[in-house]
Amino acid sequence: MTPPRPYSTGLGYESPTEHTVDRTVTSDMAANHLFHRLSELEQTQRRQNAALDNLVSKVEKTDVPKAVGIKDRIACFQWTWFTSTMATGGVANVLASVPFRSQWLYIVGVIFFVFNLCLFFMNTALLLARFRLRPGSFRHSFTDKFESLFIPASLVSIGTILINICQYGVPKAGPWLLTTMEALFWIWTVAAILISAGIYLILWSTLIFPIHTMTPVWVFPAYPLLITAPFAGNLINSSVKAGHTSTLNALPIAMAAVAVQGMGFCLSFMILAAFVYRLMTQKLPRDMQRPGVFISIGPSAFTAAGLVQLGGLAGEILPDDFMMPGMTSHAVFILKLLSAMIGLWLWGLAVWFFLVSVGSFWKYARPEHEAKIGFQMTFFSFVFPNTALLTATYQIANAFSCRPLQIVGCAMTGLLVLVWAVIFVTMIRCIWKRELLWPKEE
């Protein structure tokens, strides 16, 4: 019997030979390969489970959408909705400025005025409800690149309502309303200056607006300043119609209005210069920004309307001893002529911007153009700046006794009322179809 070899398997171990070493290495490699394979399968299974969970969650969101209540819709309300009151009050202003007067025209103007009052209070209530339902949304609205520019629309709406009160209320009421409107004029003027400067300071301190995104909407914070002269002109004119000129301090009102109007026009003119530069370097704004081009009409149109009206009332504004005794009659003539010529110059600029604004929409009238612009509240820019152009047209026509220009203004007034009606009906339709005041998809 032969003794067992050293390191034999019978003793529980074996000396490493060429064959045993190969088997050991092969076993280790197989184990490692199996381990990596199991890890890969486990990772693949995890990815598949995650993808499946994601798919299920998407299906659940699609099949069972979140219910949107009235509070959710109110939370979507923004400052831009005050453009509707600007436009509606502007239409009432134009109807009061039509030179060919009739009882039915006065009634239609009063209807627009009262409807605008209701619309303004409704917008104010809904906006306050939004701020209450969404804490922090008030502060956020001042730093939003889009919404912050439309905050002054609320103040412009108030100014438009005050102008309508001068046109429709003061001639029918006693001196008490005239005195009240005089006090409100000074309050509103101070508020317009402070809010306009404050909004621009907030924007310049917190936001950056690249020049390639520039639109005339940047002028909007200056708009409260631009209706100061029309406000003063209608206030003084209403005192003349009511026969209470002695009740009103017309000269300080007119002087302050000219100063503030010049402030707003110069500021707007500089901003519009940047807009022309943007047009030369970046072409016209995008489709969704295109309605805002009409805002460029407002600065020169409001200034022309206000200055010409104040100049025409110079005989009622200037006292007998104005600046130099015995020179009042000469001063009245000079101011009437100067205001009419400056107004005509600015009116021409407004007409030019009107032609550019209309021309920017020419491509949408072509049959081969299929793209459509979704409705938004900035569509009221089609109306409000053009109300300024029409009131300026009437003032120019009255200053130069130009009957053909008055007839052209009347024809454009009818067209403007039609445009307002189409936009307002479209707004109601979009609210009903959940295209407005509806949470956007994330």
What does each model-identified segment do?
Residues 166-202:
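A generic, well-ordered mixed alpha/beta core segment in the N-terminal half of proteins
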Residues 1-66, 442:
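Intrinsically disordered, low-complexity terminal tails of fungal membrane proteins
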Residues 124-126, 340-364, 381-442:
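C-terminal functional regions that serve as terminal interaction/effector modules
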Residues 236-238, 245-250, 257, 264, ...:
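Membrane-interfacial loop- and helix-cap regions that link adjacent transmembrane helices
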Residues 50-67, 84-100, 129-135, 169, ...:
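Membrane-proximal N-terminal segments immediately preceding the first transmembrane helix
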Residues 164-168, 195-207, 231-241, 267-284, ...:
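Internal transmembrane alpha-helix with an interfacial aromatic "cap," most often the third helix
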Residues 64-97, 109, 113, 133-163, ...:
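Juxtamembrane helix-loop boundaries in multi-pass membrane proteins
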